[in-house]
Amino acid sequence: MPGRADDDLKQFLARVALPPGWRVLHEPSVVSTNDIAREAARRGWPDRSVFVADYQTRGRGRHGRTWLCPPLAGLLMSVLLRRRDAPAYTYTMLAAVALSESIERLLALQPTIKWPNDVVVDGRKVAGVLAEASDDGREQTIVVGVGVNVNLDEAELAELPNATSLSIEAGVPVHRGELLALMLERFDSWLGGDRFTREEGLWRAWNGRLWGMDQRVRVQEGDDLLVATVLGGERDGTLLVRLDDGTVRRVIAGELLP
């Protein structure tokens, strides 16, 4: 894919100005950036530490699914947040909104958020986000993992028919560093202010980008496959849908199917 060889994250990070208080560690290859972030948390790394890799040998998504991406083709990162008292799903929302805003600003695309944790362009998955919380009795630590298909071509996504990449959708190679810098700027903005104002605004922004809103979709909930109309997301990250008989149902865990 043209553009990968020139996309040197380490050099970019050496000269870019990050928001105050943020620090980024870049590695060429890791098992998983989430694993690196969790270990860093145990070692006392500070709030707003970011771990980025050019390649992951065992990246994970929701339900332990493997996230594979060719070297230099994706933005693979984890954000360590400390002393956070909001539920983990708040930070899944935050990452999805921040990424969507960054893609829109950088490439003029119109990404939407597919419940519970995907970012899609024209209905095709371009990224996954997942926040995990841990509590040692003194503070809650959040690790937010983000995986973005940046410069993959159609052949590399052939076995994933509902996936796409930013370069495919934009029609040009995309610089991972520029996307990362925008994401951290948006992360920083959403983390500011008082908790109520932040979470209310975040919920509205997340709902405003929700894929399938007011449309009939298929919902996989455990062993049940529902056909329902999406009414919106709740502040706790659950999804409200209306069944064909008019019943409103709250989906706590599940997946929207194409």
Regions found by a protein language model. Name each.
Residues 1-105, 127:
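N-terminal lobe of the biotin/lipoate ligase/transferase fold
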Residues 28, 113-115:
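Short loop/edge segments at beta-strand edges and connector loops
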Residues 1-5, 9, 17, 84-111, ...:
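Long, positively charged amphipathic alpha-helical accessory segments at protein N-termini or as interdomain linkers
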